[in-house]
Amino acid sequence: MEGPEVTDGDNVLNLTHLGLENLNLELVSENKRKDVQQLLLPHNRLVVLPPHVNSFTHLHLLDISNNNMAYIGEEILGLTKLKTLLAKNNRLDEFSFPKELGGLRLEVLNLSGNRFEEIPDQFLQIQTLKSLSLGGNRLKSIPAEIENLISLEFLYLGGNFISSIPPELANLPYLSYLVLCDNRIQSVPPQLAQVHSLRSLSLHNLLTYLPREILSLVQLQELSLRGNPLVVRFVRDLTYTPPTLLELAGRTVKSRGIPYCPQELPENLLMYLDLASKCPNPKCGGVYFDCCVRQIKFVDFCGKYRLPLMHYLCSPECSSPCGSTSQSESDSEDEANAAARRMQKVLLG
């Protein structure tokens, strides 16, 4: 029987949909193994990597998706020119890969549809990685070490059990596409607005508002918030705990510009006064420390969306300087319907 041949003249060895449980790559001549740059093995019944796979010394792409693999052996470490590893829909988890995998110069890693409960440390060592897909797994968190993937442009973590977004994502200078849909995320850290390269953001989760800093994502072209319990009417949440005497004194000092120097106050009070936040209402000029009013305002974004953003005010008497106005009880039905349509652009992505 003749061995499998390189197909299409494109340095591709295609062994897809053959129902193979074992594969003898020695049937491929040594010269042809050196020519092959793409090895396609999806939709078989492979449990482990075929023996001698590391003899494909010029391999750039390896596709082992839709098999029965629970373990990737050290043979993969011999594929020193490998750029793309596709292993979707297997039985892989965080213990399935050799510790030295981080030494490969991978650029694309797609492991969606597996059994990962956390992102393995060795994945977070691949600084050449541009695309990481771990959708449809069992991830519960995104590690802070995600910031080590300094070349990352595309991150797909949809369909997991993630409950929070680490602020360290803001340290990825080239991140352009971020997909976190179908998780359990309830809030977005304001640091995410520092990812100025972000062009597409998918957040179908449990969000009720967005931080106002999101408006600084001027490169954003796609924003999908479908399925979130975002409020669709203007919401005034004025639950307010009166400020302490310490805060009242601090507000008075900062608002009235009362002079003080380090020799006059204890160190803890000096540090406290440095924590003052300015009220966003330009007509107010006040400050707050620990006690503030949280208020949701709808703000026009990119001329297309009305986003519910969180504002922090110094007191209930203060009104937020948001450009958009609230829907009052006297709004006409047509105006209310128009607002609903604008919100639908966000809710439906």
UniProtKB/Swiss-Prot annotation:
Keywords: Leucine-rich repeat, Repeat
Pfam families: LRR_8 (PF13855)
Each LRR repeat, start to end: 14-34, 35-56, 58-80, 81-102, 105-125, 128-149, 151-173, 174-195, 197-217, 219-239
PANTHER family attached to this UniProt entry: LEUCINE-RICH REPEAT-CONTAINING, LEUCINE-RICH REPEAT-CONTAINING PROTEIN 58
Stated name of the protein: Leucine-rich repeat-containing protein 58
Originating organism: Xenopus tropicalis
